[in-house]
């Protein structure tokens, strides 16, 4: 499933001859920009999960920005020859070590403050 969408993303860029612009720095910058646009969906409000799900317009905006962040993230993985699933699993393992359940359960503290 991930491989299929990565192929679609790469084809989308290739058809438009955008590969020349897709440097690691440019893609990383785009991830930050799209992440900021995701955050902008919540500017001056702090909705609950159910608030977001029930507000169709807000939910659609959030989905669009999540998609942009994920597309650029998958594109960067592809450009660097990295498997996004392997990268995420490795990071989850590291996070499990940093945030053991016994010390972090119910806590918002950073691992260095546990």
What are these regions (language model features)?
Residues 1-66, 70-114:
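Flexible "arm" and connector segments at domain edges
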């Amino acid at each position: 499933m991930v491989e299929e969408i990565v192929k679609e993303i790469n084809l989308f860029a290739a058809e438009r001859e955008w590969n020349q612009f897709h440097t690691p720095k440019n893609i990383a910058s785009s991830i930050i920009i799209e992440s900021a646009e995701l955050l902008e969906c919540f500017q001056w409000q702090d909705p609950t999960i159910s608030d977001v799900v029930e507000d169709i317009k807000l939910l659609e905006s959030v989905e669009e920005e999540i998609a942009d962040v994920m597309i650029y993230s998958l594109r960067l993985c592809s450009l660097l020859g990295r498997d996004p699933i392997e990268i995420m699993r490795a990071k989850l393992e590291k996070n499990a070590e940093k945030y053991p359940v016994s010390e972090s359960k119910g806590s918002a503290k950073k691992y260095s403050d546990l």
